[in-house]
């Protein structure tokens, strides 16, 4: 492996603002960078990212790589992948982390293929082996009945991290990271899809994907009427409300 000098996390933004999972993977990356004695960088892909860059710095990133283009304002898989590939090839990180989100599930496997490196997905823990300085990534296997710890031996040592595994670090308003813009030249023809409209879903209470406690029901409740007591309980607990499949 080359002696690459950074841990790189690929953050996610919505309308130019960090989404909560980015704080979680910055925390995971900060731990790894400290164990390795190297710097932590956060890559942000989108448009109008000044606010997101400032927020990422206050959460623990030393360096911010910014890839802005109006074509990246809304997620389009092929364009996002092109930008992520350019970033990783330019930076050549030692460790690369993404969140196990819909974007991470879409992009990470194809990014790994482009970089010609293995990928460990859906990790519950990432840490550095003190003796080899290699990434150890722990993930569930056999339907969650066992855990496997995978040693990564090729740079970038690439893993996706499950949401809600790491807590974001406390915000430090005084932190200011180094901001480095990276030019990304995108051709609209690269995209195989087109965003024609965006509809914001309004929901009451805690969003399910952000909830630390979930109150769930199943078919036995019979229908919407049966879920109303669960909603009251969820409100009392500050929980999200879900359903079994």
Tell where the protein language model's regions lie, with residue ranges.
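N-terminal glycine-rich FAD/FM-binding segment characteristic of electron-transfer flavoproteins
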Residues: 1-245
């Amino acid at each position: 492996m080359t002696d690459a000098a950074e841990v790189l996390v690929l953050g996610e933004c919505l309308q130019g603002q960090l989404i909560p999972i980015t704080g979680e993977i910055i925390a995971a990356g900060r731990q790894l960078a400290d164990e390795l004695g190297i710097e932590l960088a956060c890559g942000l892909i989108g448009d109008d990212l000044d606010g997101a860059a400032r927020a990422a710095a206050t959460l623990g990133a030393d360096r911010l790589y910014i890839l802005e283009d109006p074509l990246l304002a809304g997620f389009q898989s092929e364009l996002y992948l092109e930008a992520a590939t350019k970033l990783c090839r330019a930076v050549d990180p030692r460790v690369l982390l993404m969140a196990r989100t819909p974007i991470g599930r879409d992009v990470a496997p194809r990014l790994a293929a482009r970089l010609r490196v293995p990928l460990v997905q859906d990790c519950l823990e990432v840490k550095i082996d003190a003796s080899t300085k290699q990434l150890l990534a722990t993930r569930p296997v056999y339907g969650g009945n066992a855990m496997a710890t995978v040693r990564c031996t090729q740079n970038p040592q690439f893993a996706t991290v499950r949401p809600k595994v790491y807590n974001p670090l406390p915000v430090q308003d005084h932190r200011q990271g180094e901001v480095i813009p990276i030019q990304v030249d995108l051709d609209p023809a690269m995209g195989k899809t087109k965003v024609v409209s965006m509809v914001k879903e309004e929901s009451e209470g805690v969003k399910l994907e952000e909830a630390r406690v979930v109150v769930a029901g199943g078919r036995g409740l019979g229908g919407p009427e049966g879920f109303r007591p669960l909603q009251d309980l969820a409100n009392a607990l500050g929980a999200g409300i879900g359903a079994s499949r």
